[in-house]
Amino acid sequence: GKVTMGAGDVGEILATAAGVHTLDQWAGAWRAMAERLEGVARRAEVGGHCHSAGEAYLRAHEYRRQSYFFARDDLDAPDLLEAWEAQRDDFRHALRLLEVNHRMIAIPYEDTELHGYAFIPAGAGPHPVLVALSGYHAPAEEMYTVAGVPFALARGHAVVVFDGVAGVEPQTET
C-alpha cells in the first residue's frame, strides 16, 4: 500500500533493511535514508523539479516515521520528538510540492485539539467523506497512505484524517 502510493521505494527499503541487524540499528538506518532523501528533495526543488521533490519528501516522511516506530519507552525523548517533527515537516513539504488540495484542521476534544488534515478532491461538491483516525503509533500524516487518500481523491471522495487521542504526544502541535 505505502509503496503504491509513493511513500516508499522497494530499492530504498531493501537497501535500508540490509544494514539493520539489530533493533538498535533500526532508528539510525531509517534516519540516514530519510536524511538522504531530504537532500534529494531540496536539490530537486532548487532545480525546479517540484514533483520529484514532493515524491522524495513523501518517502522521507515515511522513513522518518519508521525511524521512531519502535521508540515507546519515553515518548518525551528528544530523538523521538525530533523525528516526529521531521516526518510532519517532510509530509507537509510533500503535500505542497505535489499540489495535494488539503487544509490543516483542529478538532476540539476535551481540553485539547486533535490535529489533522482535510483532503478535498477536484471538482464541485458535495463529495462523499471518508474519516480515518490514527492509532497509538500512527500520526495523522501516516493516514495519508494507510487510508488510501490518493485513491479516494481520484475517485471524488474527500478524506479527513487526524491524530487519535492516544497518538504520539506531539499530536497537539500544528
Per-region residue spans from a language model:
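Short, surface-exposed, charged/polar-biased interaction segments
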Residues: 74, 81, 108, 151-154
